Amino acid sequence: MEEIVVYVHGKGGSAQEAEHYKALFPNCEVIGFDYHAQSPWEATEEFSGFFTAVQKRCGKLTLVANSIGAFLSLSSLNEKLVDIAYFISPVVDMEQLICNMMQWANVSEAELAEKLEISTTFGETLSWKYLCYVREHPISWKIPTRILYGEKDALTSMETIKAFAEKNNAELTVMPGGEHWFHTKEQMQFLDYWIKNRRPCNETENKDGFASPAYSSGNRAGSLPCLQQGPAVRIPPGSKASV
């Protein structure tokens, strides 16, 4: 049975973005997940149902998820449904993000608890139900994971992404000067290199589900090409190395 790659888009994105990843996973079926869930409690049923159906017809299921799509995947999926995950600018601590947005909007927790929902000037609606849900349902993630993170990501701090990577034994690659939204020519080139150089088709997977390079390079193992702004920083699973 073949490998299937499922792409989960971020806010404002679409399943059609999966087309970009077909060239990066040439021997796989790549499909975009056109989900409708707007919250983790809605995603629990929708995501698990979709991935269960896909998993039944493949030998290996690879997840590629972007931004909020990564968070909804984190809150809905498990190692029984997904074999390996690639996260691009993932939201990994929704409680922290909501609290940050409350500060940006000058909204106290007491005010949000009283009003339940508050619209903001930056286009987001703060929700007391959402905040309570993520506090009551902490993320539990055991799937081998690789993360691509932009150094200038305004939604998730370096401290937060490193803490998640260390806690969940995930491999973290940082693009110097990169943003939350990978969209410029340089950023997309970096993203493509990242996937190509971390793919098992170019590498030999080890017992932990991560891949070890099967090629020789002048750079240290698994490092990505230097793209003007400096070399990528790659933190292997379990490493406490600082950026």
What are these regions (language model features)?
Residues 82-163, 167-174, 178-201:
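The alpha/beta-hydrolase serine catalytic core
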Residues 52-60:
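Gly/Ser-rich "nucleophile elbow"/oxyanion-hole loop immediately N-terminal to the catalytic nucleophile
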Residues 76-77:
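Aromatic pocket-lining residues of Rossmann-like dinucleotide-binding sites
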Residues 212, 216-221, 233, 242-243:
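Short glycine-rich, low-complexity segments
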Residues 229:
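Cationic, low-complexity basic patches in intrinsically disordered or flexible, solvent-exposed regions
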Residues 64-69, 73:
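Gly/Ala-rich beta-loop-alpha elbow adjacent to hydrolase catalytic centers
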Residues 3-27, 32, 36:
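Short, surface-exposed "cap/lid" segments of acyl-processing enzymes
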Residues 32-53:
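Catalytic nucleophile-loop/oxyanion-hole region of alpha/beta-hydrolase
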